[in-house]
Amino acid sequence: MILLRHGETVFNVLFGKNRRDPGVRDPRLTERGREQAAEAANILAQKTITRVIASPYTRALQTAHVIARTINVAIEIDATIRERFSYDCDIGTPRQTLAVRWPDYAFDEIDDTWWPDREEPISEFEARCETFRRRMAASPDWNTTAVVTHWGVVRALTGERIKNCEMLFHDPTSESNANATLESGQGTG
């Protein structure tokens, strides 16, 4: 599967200045983030992608939307690949609001409040990522699936730290996280 971190957000810009939580909830992509998403979509258009799975955070949905529109595939929403709750940016948008904003996408499989109400323990986060890895390993189309997710999820699955809109190819059938291959160095931040 191709793991793709979402494009740049206002949170990424502000947090990058002083490493302090700027208090931005469920941030949207910046103009640069939208450009990064378009670049990623063009790269993915050159590959065989039959499925796009996205986290329900707005930044991931916006990134996935550009990709899905470019390669003409539907988006599946999966809260299992949401970021680890650590900062205000990890406070999500309720399912009902997302459904109004994104009427073409199905949010039926997520709870109305799909993010935790406290900082998520690392052990719970890693277990959630492992659940996703196992589910993808059992999926016959894992090698043609793009997963639009977050820094922490990519790190938990692969051990790699990637920038906004960078991509890694990851084989979920291997329990080792040492099997990730950088697909694109286009990302920043």
Where are these regions (language model features)?
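Short, well-ordered beta-to-alpha junction loops that form the rim of enzyme active sites
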Residues: 54-58, 80-81, 110, 148-152
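Short active-site segment of divalent metal-dependent hydrolases/proteases
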Residues: 9, 153-154
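Acidic, low-complexity terminal tails and accessory targeting/binding regions
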Residues: 1, 83-104, 140-143, 155-189
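Phosphate-handling substructures
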Residues: 13-14, 18, 23-28, 70-130
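Short amphipathic alpha-helical/adjacent loop interface patches that line ligand
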Residues: 37, 129-133, 151
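A short local structural element in Rossmann-fold oxidoreductases
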Residues: 64-65, 137, 158-159
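Glycine-rich phosphate-binding loop signature in dinucleotide/nucleotide-binding domains
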Residues: 45-48, 136-143
